[in-house]
Amino acid sequence: MKHFGPKEFWIRLTERFQADDVDYEEWYKNHKPTMEELQRQRDTEFEYEPLISILVPVYNTPEEFLKQMIQSVRKQTYGKWELCIANANPANETVAEILRISSTKDERIKVKDVPENEGIAQNTNAALASAMGDYIGLLDHDD
């Protein structure tokens, strides 16, 4: 920066670290845990096992995204969690059915219908109202 100034420094920095330079698939292949490692994680018992409340506001979430999000939480190796979902459009029958089936299959999944979409902050607060955890995590419905 001393030799080129802030503008040239920024240009050189951004040219050097482009998102295209990061091959996520390659990185994931090199860092993906083995089945044995995942089982070891599941079998690990901690002295303190806090309940993690994961808050997710949903509103007309595409079916595949919603299913993948729920499945990704269910596959966590740490089992002391609850998924608190605030459904801001209960009239969407597809979303409502996915949530009903998921919460029936796994009691850690709690669904609260929000009568009217009040935006992400208020919908998240609706999910928070059903949370019982020691810690809170936030997750987007399409993650």
Task: Give the positions of each predicted feature.
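Acidic donor-binding segment of Leloir-type glycosyltransferases
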Residues: 70-116
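N-proximal low-complexity "stem/linker" segments adjacent to membrane-targeting elements
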Residues: 4-74
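The conserved acidic donor/metal-binding loop of glycosyltransferases
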Residues: 140-143
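Short alpha-helix within the catalytic core of nucleotide-sugar-dependent glycosyltransferases
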Residues: 67-71, 96, 125, 133
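Short aromatic/hydrophobic "clamp" motif used to bind/position activated sugar donors
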Residues: 136
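Residues that form or flank phosphate/diphosphate-binding pockets in enzymes
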Residues: 64-65, 93-94, 122
